[in-house]
C-alpha cells in the first residue's frame, strides 16, 4: 500500500469519527459530557468550525466503505454542533446519518437537545439470537454460548433518538448551564468543574436526561425476514463531578437509569431495564519529565430487566438482543464482537491506565495539522464482565469473561479520538471511536 493511500485511509477514518462520533456514541455510551465550550489559553472567544470532505475505510462487515461527511459547530450556538454523512460500500451497503448535540432551547436555557437519525441498508449484519440450526439446544448470547451461535444476513438498521437534558442550577452550573474550559496543549489550565469534593450543591454538574428512542432492525434469512422494532423512553440522573469531562483526570461520575418500551405503535414487545454506573479517576504521581498526565480510571456498570419473564419456554418482555444487558463492542468488553453477550442481567468492570507523554511528534506531520492534535495518549486496560438469567451477585461474579488491551488516543479538534485493541479467549477486537469508553 502506498504512503499516499495510507494517508487517505487514516485521514478519512479520523474525519468520519469526528463527524459521526457524537451520534455513534449513543449506541452504547451511557454518560456523555455536559454541555461545554472548550478553548485554548489566550483565546478570547470560540471560533466556529466547518468541515466537509470525502472519507474511506475498510471493515469486515462493510468491506470498503466510502462517502462524504460535512457539518459544523459554533455557528448557531457556541456549544452546539450538527453533522451528517452519506455512505456506500463495495458490498452494496449504504446509509445516511444526521446528528446534532447541545442545542440550547431558546426559552429555557437549562434545557439542551441532542438528536440522532439514521437509515442504513447493510449487506452483512450479525445478531446473537436463537435460530442457528447448529445450536438448537443452546441459548445464543448467553455467558456459556458458543461464539459461532449467531444469525447473519442482510437487512436494515434504522433509528431515531431525541435526548433532552436539564442542567440543574447548582454546583459548577449554578451560574451558567454551560461550563467553559481553557486548555494549554490539551491539558486543563482553567478552574476545574469538579473533582475535589463530592457535593452536588457545590461541585460538579448534575443532569436529568430524557431520551425518546425508536429503532427498527431487519435480518434477511432466505425467505424469512425477522423484524425487531422498539421505541420508548429512557430517564437518567447523572452527577458528573470531574475536573474536565472530556478527558477527566480526577473526580467521579454516577448514573442511575430507567428505560421502558411501553409497547406503543409498532413495538415488538414491552420491556423495562434499570441500571447503575459509577466511574472514578485518580491522578497518579508524576515527575513531569516523561509524562504530562497519568491517570487511573475505574468503571463499574450493572443492569437488570425486571420485566423479563419466561412464557412457554420463550423469553418475553425483554429488550432486543442489541440493547439493554449486552456486552461486547465499542464500550464494554472490547475483546468480543458487538453484542456478543446478552441476557436478563449484566455486570461489568474496567480499569484503564491513561498516560500522555511529554514527547509529541504529531504536530510536525504536515498532513495531520488539519486535526489540530494537542496530545496523544497511550492506554492499557483490563475488563471483566458477565451476563446472566438473573441478577445475583454470586452468579454474576462466577465464570466471568475477561479481556485486556491497549489503546492509542488523540485530542483532535478538542475531541478525544481512540483506537483500542483488545484480546480475549475468542479473538482480538479492534475499535475506533470518539470519546473515552467512560
Residue ranges and their predicted role:
Residues 1-38:
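Cleavable N-terminal export/targeting peptides
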Residues 26-128, 149-154, 161-165, 174-177, ...:
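Outer-membrane beta-barrel initiation region
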Residues 50-52, 80-85, 110-116, 206-210, ...:
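Transmembrane beta-strands of outer-membrane beta-barrel proteins
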Residues 120-122, 210-217, 257-264, 301-307, ...:
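Short glycine-rich beta-strand segments
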Residues 130-137, 181-182, 223-229, 271-275, ...:
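Flexible, surface-exposed loop regions and adjacent strand-edge segments
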Residues 164, 168, 406-412, 427-438:
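Outer-membrane beta-barrel "beta-signal"
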Residues 233-238, 242-371:
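C-terminal outer-membrane beta-barrel translocator/porin domains of Gram-negative envelope proteins
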Residues 352-364, 369-404:
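Outer-membrane beta-barrel transmembrane domain signature
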Amino acid at each position: 500500500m502506498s504512503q499516499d493511500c495510507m494517508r487517505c485511509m487514516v485521514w478519512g477514518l479520523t474525519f468520519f469519527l469526528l463527524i459521526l462520533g457524537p451520534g455513534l456514541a449513543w449506541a452504547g455510551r451511557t454518560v456523555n459530557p455536559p454541555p461545554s465550550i472548550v478553548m485554548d489559553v489566550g483565546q478570547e472567544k470560540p471560533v466556529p468550525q466547518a468541515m466537509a470532505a470525502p472519507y474511506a475505510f475498510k471493515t469486515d462487515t462493510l468491506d470498503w466503505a466510502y462517502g462524504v461527511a460535512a457539518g459544523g459547530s459554533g455557528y448557531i450556538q457556541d456549544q452546539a454542533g450538527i453533522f451528517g454523512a452519506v455512505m456506500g460500500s463495495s458490498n452494496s451497503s449504504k446509509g445516511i446519518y444526521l446528528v446534532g448535540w447541545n442545542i440550547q432551547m431558546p426559552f429555557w436555557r437549562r434545557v439542551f437537545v441532542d438528536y440522532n437519525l439514521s437509515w442504513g441498508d447493510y449487506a452483512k449484519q450479525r445478531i446473537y439470537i436463537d435460530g442457528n440450526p447448529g445450536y438448537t439446544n443452546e441459548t445464543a448470547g448467553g455467558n456459556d454460548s458458543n461464539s459461532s451461535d449467531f444469525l447473519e444476513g442482510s437487512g436494515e438498521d434504522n433509528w431515531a433518538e431525541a435526548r433532552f437534558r436539564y442542567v440543574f442550577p447548582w454546583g459548577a452550573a449554578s451560574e451558567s448551564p454551560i461550563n467553559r474550559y481553557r486548555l494549554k496543549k490539551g491539558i486543563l489550565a482553567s478552574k476545574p468543574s469538579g473533582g475535589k469534593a463530592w457535593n452536588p450543591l457545590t461541585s460538579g454538574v448534575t443532569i436529568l436526561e430524557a431520551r425518546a428512542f425508536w429503532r427498527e432492525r431487519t435480518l434477511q434469512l432466505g425467505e424469512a425476514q425477522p423484524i425487531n422494532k422498539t421505541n420508548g423512553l429512557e430517564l437518567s440522573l447523572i452527577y458528573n463531578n470531574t475536573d474536565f469531562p472530556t478527558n477527566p483526570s480526577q473526580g467521579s461520575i454516577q448514573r442511575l437509569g430507567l428505560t421502558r418500551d411501553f409497547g406503543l405503535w409498532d413495538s415488538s414487545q414491552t420491556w423495562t431495564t434499570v441500571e447503575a454506573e459509577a466511574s472514578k479517576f485518580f491522578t497518579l504521581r508524576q515527575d513531569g519529565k516523561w509524562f504530562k498526565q497519568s491517570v487511573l480510571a475505574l468503571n463499574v456498570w450493572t443492569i437488570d430487566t425486571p420485566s423479563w419473564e419466561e412464557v412457554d419456554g420463550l423469553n418475553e418482555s425483554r429488550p432486543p438482543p442489541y440493547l439493554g444487558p449486552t456486552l461486547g463492542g465499542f464500550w464494554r468488553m472490547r475483546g468480543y464482537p458487538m453484542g456478543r453477550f446478552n441476557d436478563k442481567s449484566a455486570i461489568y468492570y474496567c480499569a484503564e491506565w491513561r498516560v500522555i507523554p511529554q514527547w509529541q511528534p504529531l504536530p510536525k506531520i504536515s498532513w495531520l495539522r488539519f486535526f489540530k492534535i494537542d496530545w496523544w495518549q497511550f492506554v492499557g486496560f483490563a475488563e471483566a464482565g458477565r451476563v446472566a438469567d438473573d441478577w445475583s451477585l454470586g452468579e454474576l461474579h462466577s465464570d466471568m469473561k475477561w479481556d485486556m488491551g491497549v489503546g492509542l488516543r488523540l485530542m483532535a479538534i478538542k475531541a478525544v479520538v481512540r483506537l483500542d485493541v483488545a484480546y480475549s479467549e475468542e479473538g482480538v477486537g479492534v475499535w475506533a471511536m470518539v470519546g473515552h469508553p467512560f
